[in-house]
Amino acid sequence: MPMDERIIKTRALRDVLLGDRYRSRYHIVAPEGVCLPFDPNGALYWKGRYHLMYIVQTEQGHCWAHISSRDLLHWRQHPLALEPGGVDTGIFSGGAFIDQTGVPTITYWGLGPDAGICTATSTDDDLEVWTKAERPIIHQAESGLTVLPDGTPVGVADPSAIWWHDGHYYMLTGNLLVQIEYWRKRGLAEHQGDTLYLFRSDDLVHWEYLHPFYQSRREWTRADEDNMCPDFFPLGDRHMLLFISHNLGCQYYIGRYADDRFTPETHGRMTWVDRAFFAPESLVDERGRRIMWAWIFEGTTRAVQEAALWAGTMSLPRVLWLGDDKTLRMAPPRHSPRAV
């Protein structure tokens, strides 16, 4: 299609979208097209700007789009951050962090038989140029799973952002085994309930599996709930683990982190009625605020979404902190404490 015709069609599409009374004016929404999934990923505060990636679908497959803001209200659209190619055939959920040398680094779940847990790095101020690693840091034997030398399967989907602790890098991977094993083969106790898998590295290239990160407790979650899209970080004098189960949406644990293990003390949900609050992602800014987003399901059918020519809405950003009673508090950034 000639470029001038593309411009005319794009302008016409923008006019249609701007006239949609159901399209939010102040939430982050998909620029156009039905985005399923629309997970926020790779959140990072970098050189005075809040950067947020999210999954979109193009002719090439699942990609990461990229937006940034100085004030969490006005957002700039950047070129796509990650596209399929090389070892992967699609880009699924992951996180972002700044390594010990100051390099912004993305972790993501690369789709395809030669992929797994993958990384990419950027060295430009706008984070517009990302270079993928030549090979996965953890290869998947099948989609979302790796197999240890003793034959034990371990989930390797939806990696968390990497963090540095006591001289090592650490990373969590999602518990896809609940879906693969327990949902299909009822009664396998070893695959019941949410958990995560902890990996450790000294160089961000070679990773060793340590053990399950925490023990799931049935008084809080159901046996058929997985743990995916994990986001783990310090909050006050505790640590918080944000995650989803695919059947009940966004939830969290607050607890203690020591000796490479997490001990949940309390549990809460951010989807009180359904699972429409989904796929959480957070960052910490220069003021020390822990700010999160999530994907909000519109609650409409695929046919309605395709007729509207778009789908994909983010929650408003919210700051998280602990109250004096060690329970979770949250508020829009403008109304939150200065540093939490």
Residue ranges and their predicted role:
Residues 1-228, 234-274, 287, 294-340:
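Beta-rich carbohydrate-recognition and catalytic domains
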